[in-house]
């Protein structure tokens, strides 16, 4: 029994100011008394003395007090039997409050001895606090809770130890937790978990390592709930992944308090054959035994499989880290967090989360979560995300798809039959991707499908999917089906034979075999034959019957692949020959009579077949002749009816398209669809009765021109010496070609395509007429033109009809016109008197010329031209066109300027004295008429000198270089002759009126005015614009060649609309369109459909109206200036663009947005066409003067200003136009919309590309014009903005 007074006295001595040694001695004496007593007496006095000694600066006294605390703390909570619990609780609380902080501070001491004493003291303090608080965590007094000693100790340790300022104190405090847990098995760690996890992120490495080791030690043997809390806390605090994975690997990999079965990591695979689940179970230490049936399913000899790695191998190859699960709820939470990522379609925002989800599920398999919590729970959670896995398999991102495919493969290997709820969806999806474009994905999917078939028990679905794959057209799918068939038979045929035979399995197998062994692909065929012999090993009878039912060739190939232990001779049955009955064979063989009888029967049968063929051919020929005669009669009847109709309407002037005319400058022929010639000089004086241009069109291909230019560069040894100057060039034009039109590309005088065609016709006509045609030709060479009789056109038409193909006459489409060169009017077959004594015959050089040989022309047959789109030749139109042309040439005299220019170059010395026999050359073709009637050089020279006093124009040079076919008329006055030429040219070049050529155009315009126009109306108007176009090139030629007064029409922007005024009449194409206000009414009608919003019609009609307006701008642009409608056109386009841009920014339906974009693109095209044709200076001023809305800036800059600026000179743009446009460009560059900024940058980039060719430092000058030059007085914000903008512009300038 301890003396309380003695204890109290010793405590007082310790607190007094006596010497340190005496205080230390008193402390030791106090410790001896308490140990001898076995319990604490006067606890308040002792606690106060310990606190004073511990705070003393003397190290000996403080160290002695630290050594005293463990003894005192171990005795303070036990007390005497008479002490109440409340008294003991008070004593412990007081001790912890008094010395707790002081002892924790000693943990940071430099001496290990002191730190060790402090750790011992803290452990005893913690034990005392836990012991006294284990039964009563809280006590209530007057409704108020009091903090327990354990709570005080935990708070002190957390705030002063784990959260201390010194790293050593934090390290020692966290290392103290495992000791506390070891001394007290149920010591609560949860209150300190958050602070301990935070120490994993501490800046000091020793603290981080101490926290890691503490967590591993504390939670290795903790309950699953505690481990789940640790995992959540690690994720919540965003601990470094490597650190967290290492801790979880140690914690979750160790057995918990609720689990005793060890979890081992899977070993690496040791085989390359398809791995079954039994091998994985054994490798993971599972208790399940290996089924013997799986072991019997080893591959047969000679059968190979693709390499199928194990689940752990594929995961290790992809760098998959284990994902540990602490509890069932943690597993459910893991799968639940993935589900939102698989909703909707794959996008840039969710594909990465999907890939991480696939990796996480693979990590679960690596960590063995499916074995830890049971396959049933794991598969149930997997079923919830199965649809997302299928989406990932079908992804176009290769990494995501490969992760998903490997996941399914590993699931099949790890789960086996437990994967049954998910097998059907997985297998159907994987087999269906065998024909995927990416071979890597296709091969991986088939490996995964094979893994399912190997590791999951047999089900009829396997054979059904394989049979469906065999029926696919894709080769890869059929090859994969054959491989799967081998896999299924190798794996399941032995131990699942009854399952295979049920549900029609044998029938499906036979179908697959029969289909596969005869497959066209070698790989699928070979694999199917291997599968057949596996099938034969288990179902020999069915396999033998199947083999004998195959074709002999296939049966032989299948038998060649038989294994060595199979006797194919006993399997394959010898098929008897299918004869009608038994044949009795003579001993000496067949008799001679029998052989002769067989030969005679065979000969008779052959003759009978030939006779039938001849009869059929004759009947077909008669049918064709009858059809040709009927067609000829019908054509003649229609011709008479049309002729009568034309005679009744002789007062109406039709637009004429000559047969061999075109406004194209080229040297070849090509068919044209629905287009007509519309040059100003396209109508002769006698061509009023010809049919419209839509009946026949022949244009000249520029490609052929290049070929002929190459051909004429070859020397022509057989050609005669030309009588004209070497620089003379002629062009291929129609019979009514004006004398002042000159092609931009000169052509060789000997290679006119018109003459080539006429020459081919002439040769065929001469060959068919025989000597009569030769006599006629001789007469033509010696008789003056005025004395010749007019030709008989009826015989010509019949001769032409005989050479025409009548196939497909009934299938002719009026909308598709294709010309045949042999069906043109044959002016060379007979002579015609046109009233002026000039020869209109067109001829071409002989085919022995080198140029014709290079072109590959065949003059022995009619010169056909390919039909466009496979259409038949329009025979009726050609006949009527030729008849009208002949009648017109007979009735109307042709002026000199309209004669057809000869294409033959002949020596002048021989031309006038050519004998009659020379009309036929060595090739059998007639000599060109020009060689028989060419004048002498003196005559030609006199004609040139007399006809032109001043410098001749281009057309005059062409005429002067062309040899005339009659003697010059020296008695005619030169002035009078020139005046007659101009009058004839004006009469022949009067442009055809669209209103007269197409009288129904007024009906179309009225439909526009009434709002009843349909798509056909707009299509016809667009075609009308193309047919009667006004070429800017022709306008320039007319302006150059015409000597009369030039009149400029109104037009503020273009300044190119003009007409030629002569005697009060306009001969240009402008006047033809202005007749009756045609163009103005057409434009007014179009505006009704161009309106954006209400009144504009449907979107389809509005787009059709845009097309017509675009064609008007392209083909009749000068009319807008002539009618003062150019400003109105610009206003309509700009207003429509403004309205459409404003509508696009508002909230409208998606269909309206698409329609609005299409309409906006149409108006931008019209604006771009206007910008490319108007005068750039005037057009820029007009466009800049319009008030532009903010929404339409992009469209106007892109389609309006850019085409105008790039057409201007560089210096003018930099000095004048770009500074005027600078405010608009600068505001657009600073706009918030990226589209507008990019548009402005694009405009400046185009300008820089144009300007830097002619100007140095183009970008500097552009920046100066825009006001972007950096000045000294710029403030900081403005300087920063300018620099950023200059950097962007320089970047785009330097890209090109």
Curated annotation (Swiss-Prot):
Chain residue ranges for the region called Disordered: 258-287, 735-793, 888-946, 953-972
InterPro entries assigned to the protein according to its UniProt record, in alphabetical order: ARM-like, ARM-type_fold, CLASP_N_dom, TOG
Keywords noted in UniProt: Cell cycle, Cell division, Coiled coil, Cytoplasm, Cytoskeleton, Microtubule, Mitosis, Nucleus
A GO term, aspect molecular function: microtubule binding
Keyword NAD among UniProt keywords: no
SMART domains attached to this UniProt entry: TOG
Biased composition annotated in UniProt, kind: Polar residues: 277-287, 953-964
GO terms under cellular component: cytoplasmic microtubule; microtubule organizing center; mitotic spindle; mitotic spindle midzone; nucleus; spindle microtubule
Localization per record: Cytoplasm, Cytoskeleton; Nucleus; Cytoplasm, Cytoskeleton, Spindle
Keyword Cell cycle: yes
Biased composition (Low complexity): 755-782, 900-919, 933-946
GO biological process, one term: mitotic spindle assembly
Record's function text: Microtubule binding protein that promotes the stabilization of dynamic microtubules. Required for mitotic spindle formation.
PANTHER family reported in the protein's UniProt record: CLASP, CLIP-ASSOCIATING PROTEIN
Entry's family note: Belongs to the CLASP family.
Subunit structure: Interacts with microtubules.
Protein name according to UniProt: Protein STU1
């Amino acid at each position: 029994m301890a003396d309380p007074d003695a204890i109290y006295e010793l405590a007082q001595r310790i607190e007094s100011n006596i010497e340190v040694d005496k205080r230390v001695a008193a402390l030791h004496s106090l410790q001896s008394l308490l140990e001898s007593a076995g319990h604490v007496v006067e606890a308040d006095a002792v606690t106060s003395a310990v606190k004073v000694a511990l705070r003393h600066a003397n190290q000996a006294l403080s160290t002695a007090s630290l050594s005293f605390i463990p003894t005192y703390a171990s005795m303070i909570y036990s007390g005497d039997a008479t002490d109440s619990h409340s008294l003991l609780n008070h004593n412990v609380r007081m001790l912890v409050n008094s010395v707790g902080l002081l002892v924790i501070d000693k943990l940071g001491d430099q001496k290990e001895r002191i730190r060790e004493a402090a750790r011992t003291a803290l452990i005893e303090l913690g034990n005392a606090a836990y012991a006294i608080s284990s039964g009563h965590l809280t006590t209530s007094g007057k409704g108020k809770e009091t903090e327990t000693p354990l709570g005080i100790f935990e708070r002190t340790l957390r705030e002063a130890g784990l959260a201390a300022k010194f790293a050593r104190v934090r390290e020692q405090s966290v290392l103290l937790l495992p000791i506390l847990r070891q001394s007290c098995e149920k010591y609560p760690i949860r209150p300190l978990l958050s602070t301990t996890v935070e120490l994993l992120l501490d800046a000091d490495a020793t603290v981080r390592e101490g926290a890691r080791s503490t967590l591993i030690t504390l939670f290795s043997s903790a309950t699953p709930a505690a481990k789940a809390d640790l995992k959540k806390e690690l994720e919540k605090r965003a601990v470094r992944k490597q650190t967290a994975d290492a801790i979880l690997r140690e914690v979750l990999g160790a057995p918990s308090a609720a689990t005793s079965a060890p979890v081992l990591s899977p070993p690496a695979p040791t085989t390359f054959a398809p791995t079954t689940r039994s091998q994985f179970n054994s490798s993971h230490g599972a208790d399940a035994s290996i089924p013997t049936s799986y072991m019997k399913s080893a591959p047969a000899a000679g059968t190979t499989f693709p390499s199928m790695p194990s689940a752990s191998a594929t995961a290790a190859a992809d760098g998959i880290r284990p994902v540990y699960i602490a509890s069932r709820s943690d597993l459910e939470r893991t799968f639940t967090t993935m589900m939102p990522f698989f909703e909707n379609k794959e996008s840039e925002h969710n594909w990465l989360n999907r890939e991480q989800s696939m990796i996480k599920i693979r990590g679960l398999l690596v960590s063995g979560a499916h074995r830890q919590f049971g396959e049933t729970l794991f598969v149930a959670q997997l079923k919830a995300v199965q649809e997302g896995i299928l989406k990932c398999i079908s992804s176009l991102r290769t990494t995501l798809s490969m992760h998903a495919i490997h996941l399914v493969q590993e699931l099949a290997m790890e789960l086996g039959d437990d994967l049954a709820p998910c097998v059907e969806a997985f297998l159907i999806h994987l087999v269906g991707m065998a024909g995927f474009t990416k071979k890597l994905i296709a091969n991986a999917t088939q490996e995964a499908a094979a893994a399912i078939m190997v590791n999951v028990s047999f089900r009829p679905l396997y054979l059904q999917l394989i049979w469906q794959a065999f029926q696919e057209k894709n080769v890869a799918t059929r090859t994969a089906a054959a491989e799967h068939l081998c896999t299924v038979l190798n794996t399941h045929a032995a131990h699942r034979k009854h399952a295979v035979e049920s549900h029609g399995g044998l029938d499906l197998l036979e179908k697959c075999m029969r289909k596969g062994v005869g497959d066209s692909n070698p790989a699928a065929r070979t694999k199917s034959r291997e599968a057949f012999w596996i099938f034969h090993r288990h179902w020999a009878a069915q396999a033998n019957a199947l083999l004998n039912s195959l074709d002999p060739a296939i049966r032989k190939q299948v038998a060649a692949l038989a294994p060595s232990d199979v006797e194919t001779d006993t399997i394959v049955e010898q098929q008897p020959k299918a004869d009608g009955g038994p044949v009795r064979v003579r001993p000496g063989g067949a008799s001679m009579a029998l052989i002769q009888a067989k030969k005679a029967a065979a000969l008779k049968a052959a003759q009978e077949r030939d006779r039938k063929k001849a009869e059929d051919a004759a009947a077909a020929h008669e049918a064709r002749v009858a059809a040709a005669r009927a067609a000829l009669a019908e054509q003649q009847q229609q011709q008479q009816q049309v002729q009568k109709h034309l005679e009744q309407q002789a007062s109406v002037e039709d637009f004429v398209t000559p047969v061999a005319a075109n406004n194209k400058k080229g040297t070849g022929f090509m068919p044209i669809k629905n287009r007509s010639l519309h040059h100003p000089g396209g109508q002769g004086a006698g061509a009023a009765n010809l049919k419209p241009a839509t009946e026949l069109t022949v244009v000249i291909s520029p490609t052929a021109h290049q070929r002929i230019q190459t051909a004429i560069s070859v020397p022509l040894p057989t050609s005669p010496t030309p009588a004209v100057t070497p620089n003379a060039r002629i062009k291929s034009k129609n019979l009514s070609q004006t004398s002042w039109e000159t092609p931009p590309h000169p052509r060789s005088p000997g290679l006119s395509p018109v003459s080539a065609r006429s020459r081919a016709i002439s040769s065929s006509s001469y060959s068919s007429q025989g000597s009569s045609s030769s006599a006629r030709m001789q007469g033509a060479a010696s008789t003056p033109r005025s004395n010749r009789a007019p030709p008989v056109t009826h015989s010509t038409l019949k001769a032409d009809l005989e050479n025409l193909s009548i196939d497909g006459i009934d299938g002719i489409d009026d909308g598709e016109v294709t010309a045949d060169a042999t069906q043109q009017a044959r002016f060379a077959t007979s002579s015609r008197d046109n009233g002026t004594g000039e020869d209109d015959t067109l001829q071409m050089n002989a085919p022995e010329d080198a140029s014709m040989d290079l072109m590959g022309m065949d003059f022995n047959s009619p010169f056909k031209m390919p039909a466009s789109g496979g259409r038949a030749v329009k025979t009726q139109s050609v006949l009527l066109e030729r008849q009208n042309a002949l009648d017109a040439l007979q009735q109307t005299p042709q002026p000199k300027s309209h004669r057809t220019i000869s294409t033959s170059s002949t020596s002048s010395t021989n031309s006038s004295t050519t004998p009659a026999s020379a009309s036929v050359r060595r090739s059998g073709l007639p000599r060109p008429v020009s060689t028989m009637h060419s004048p002498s050089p003196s005559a030609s020279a006199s004609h040139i000198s007399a006809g032109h006093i001043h410098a001749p124009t281009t057309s005059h040079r062409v005429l002067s270089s062309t040899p005339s076919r009659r003697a010059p008329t020296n008695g005619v006055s030169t002035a009078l002759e020139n005046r007659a030429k101009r009058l004839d040219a004006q009469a022949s070049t009067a442009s055809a009126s669209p209103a007269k050529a197409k009288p129904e155009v007024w009906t179309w315009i009225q439909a526009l005015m009434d709002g009843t126009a349909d798509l056909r109306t707009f299509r016809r108007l667009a075609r009308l614009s193309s047919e009667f176009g006004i070429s800017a090139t022709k306008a320039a030629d007319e302006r150059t060649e015409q000597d009369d007064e030039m009149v400029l029409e109104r037009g503020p922007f273009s300044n190119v609309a003009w007409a030629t005024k002569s005697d009060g009449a306009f001969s240009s194409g402008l006047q033809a369109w202005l007749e009756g206000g045609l163009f103005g009414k057409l434009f007014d009608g179009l505006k009704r459909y161009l309106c954006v919003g209400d009144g504009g019609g449907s979107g389809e009609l509005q787009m059709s109206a845009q097309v017509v307006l675009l064609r008007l701008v392209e083909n009749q642009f000068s009319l807008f200036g002539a009618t003062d409608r150019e400003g109105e056109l610009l206003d309509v386009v700009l207003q429509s663009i403004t309205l459409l841009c404003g509508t696009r920014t508002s909230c409208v339906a998606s269909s309206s947005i698409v329609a609005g974009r299409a309409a906006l693109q149409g108006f931008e095209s019209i604006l771009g066409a206007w910008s490319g044709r108007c005068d750039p200076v005037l057009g820029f001023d007009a466009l800049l003067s319009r008030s532009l809305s903010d929404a339409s800036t992009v469209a106007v800059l892109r389609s309006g200003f850019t085409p105008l600026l790039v057409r201007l000179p560089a210096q003018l743009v930099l000095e004048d136009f770009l500074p005027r446009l600078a405010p608009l460009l600068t505001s657009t560059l600073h706009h918030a919309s990226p589209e507008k900024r990019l548009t402005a940058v694009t405009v400046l980039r185009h300008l820089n590309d144009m300007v830097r060719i002619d100007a140095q430092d183009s970008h500097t000058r552009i920046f100066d014009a825009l006001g972007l030059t950096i000045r000294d007085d710029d403030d900081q914000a403005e300087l920063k903005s300018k620099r950023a903008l200059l950097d962007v512009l320089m970047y785009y300038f330097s890209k090109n």
